[in-house]
């Protein structure tokens, strides 16, 4: 099976060491452009752009990078409860049109109650997934060209529709990750790609089986992807030394403070990540060549594949054998590591060919929209 491999834009910061200002790097537009162009040239299929209060806005970053890239796709966040699904559909179609079909969307329900409260979203875990399901239903239908009336528990819309369709038909694919039962139900019902963080293969196998069974019960099929960091070097010994260096400046207080902050999250996935390392710097190889050191201070994806090119490729194949076809990778610092992955890992992978998109679909000549609702029709001939 050929693999899709994405990279990551570190809009929340970058550097040579975790949890330290030493070796830190200024992340400005010029730097993000360097990473995006490197990923584009090296053959990555796309880049994940993170979301949250610690990040630059993912939609604006993606839009700014369209003119300076050629084939790279942009995986940006949809935030149910923070934005109208109708407006989100319109924005999604516009981004897809401006990028000529290079827009992908990642449904993010959120897991930090403090951050969500600051955004004006005051729903508990169960309610957020209810609202996310309603949001996704409306968003999908509007993007697919339907006029939607919906009266849900959390969201109500009347006459929601889209005048300018996306390039990708019937709409751009939707990605989503979540480990709770509610998240798996949502994935099985409405998304194309279910994402998991980099847990050991045995745990990933269980999650895939659960989501696959739930999707089959609804008459659907779902693809699977995984989010991992990677530390690849010419030798496995060198890679492990690089892993040790990455956390060399972490002290116990920094780790404890980070884990205390993560403990307030109601994200099941975050809880599963924390359980892999227990907040300790020892015994971080939790599965062959799978290292949990990143998660000591980083929320979300907290594990890395560590080794030389053939070794990391072999571990990726183990996940592929479970049904994973998309790998969203990252590494510190992200510019240098993109090149290391391209040069040391890609030669050992069977990659999906990154083909240029089809020619841009022109907007149909129509005149100005009447009253923000109606597209002018050709006058009848009497």
UniProtKB/Swiss-Prot annotation:
Catalytic activity field: an alkanesulfonate + FMNH2 + O2 = an aldehyde + FMN + sulfite + H2O + 2 H(+)
Superkingdom as given in the UniProt entry: Bacteria
Record-linked Gene3D superfamilies: Luciferase-like domain (3.20.20.30)
EC number, as in UniProt: 1.14.14.5
Keywords of this entry: Flavoprotein, FMN, Monooxygenase, Oxidoreductase
GO molecular function: alkanesulfonate monooxygenase activity
Alphabetical list of InterPro entries matching this protein: Alkanesulphonate_mOase_FMN-dep, Luciferase-like_dom, Luciferase-like_sf, SsuD_RutA_monooxygenase
GO biological process: alkanesulfonate catabolic process
UniProt cross-references to Pfam families, sorted A to Z: Bac_luciferase
Other comment: FMNH(2) which is absolutely required for this enzymatic reaction, is provided by SsuE.
PANTHER family (UniProt xref): ALKANESULFONATE MONOOXYGENASE (PTHR42847), ALKANESULFONATE MONOOXYGENASE-RELATED (PTHR42847:SF4)
Similarity comment text for this entry: Belongs to the SsuD family.
Main function: Catalyzes the desulfonation of aliphatic sulfonates.
UniProt subunit comment: Homotetramer.
Name of the protein described by the UniProt record: Alkanesulfonate monooxygenase
Species lineage: Bacteria, Pseudomonadati, Pseudomonadota, Gammaproteobacteria, Enterobacterales
Gene, per the UniProt record: ssuD
């Amino acid at each position: 099976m050929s693999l899709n491999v994405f990279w990551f834009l570190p809009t929340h910061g970058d550097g040579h060491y975790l949890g330290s200002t030493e070796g830190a790097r200024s992340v400005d537009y010029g730097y993000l452009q360097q990473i995006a162009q490197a990923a584009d040239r090296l053959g990555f299929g796309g880049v994940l752009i993170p979301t949250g209060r610690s990040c630059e806005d993912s939609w604006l970053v993606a839009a700014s990078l369209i003119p300076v890239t050629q084939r790279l796709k942009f995986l940006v966040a949809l935030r149910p409860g923070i934005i109208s699904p109708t407006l989100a559909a319109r924005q999604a179609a516009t981004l897809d049109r401006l990028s000529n079909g290079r827009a992908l969307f990642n449904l993010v329900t959120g897991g930090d109650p403090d951050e969500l409260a600051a955004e004006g979203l005051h729903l508990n875990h169960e309610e957020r997934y209810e609202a996310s399901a309603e949001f996704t239903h409306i968003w999908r239908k509007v993007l697919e060209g339907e006029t939607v009336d919906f009266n849900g528990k959390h969201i109500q819309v009347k006459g929601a529709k889209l005048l300018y369709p996306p390039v990708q038909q019937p709409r751009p694919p939707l990605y989503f990750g979540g480990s709770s039962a509610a998240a798996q139900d949502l994935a099985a019902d409405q998304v194309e790609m279910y994402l998991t963080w980099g847990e050991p293969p045995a745990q990933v196998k269980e999650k895939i089986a659960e989501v696959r069974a739930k999707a089959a019960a609804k008459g659907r099929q779902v693809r699977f992807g995984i989010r991992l960091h990677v530390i690849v070097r010419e030798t496995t010994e060198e890679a492990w030394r690089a892993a040790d260096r990455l956390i060399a400046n972490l002290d116990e207080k920094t780790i404890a403070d980070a884990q205390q902050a993560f403990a307030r999250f109601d994200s099941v996935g975050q809880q599963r990540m924390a359980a892999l390392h227990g907040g300790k710097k020892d015994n971080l190889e939790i599965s062959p060549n799978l290292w949990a050191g990143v998660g000591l201070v980083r929320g979300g994806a907290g594990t890395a594949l560590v080794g030389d090119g053939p070794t990391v490729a072999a571990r990726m194949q183990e996940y592929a054998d479970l049904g994973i076809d998309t790998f969203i990778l990252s590494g510190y610092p992200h510019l240098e590591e993109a090149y290391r992955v391209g040069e040391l890992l890609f030669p050992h992978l069977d990659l999906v060919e990154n083909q240029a998109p089809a020619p841009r679909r022109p907007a149909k000549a129509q005149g100005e929209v009447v009253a923000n609702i109606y597209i002018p029709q050709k006058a009848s001939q009497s």
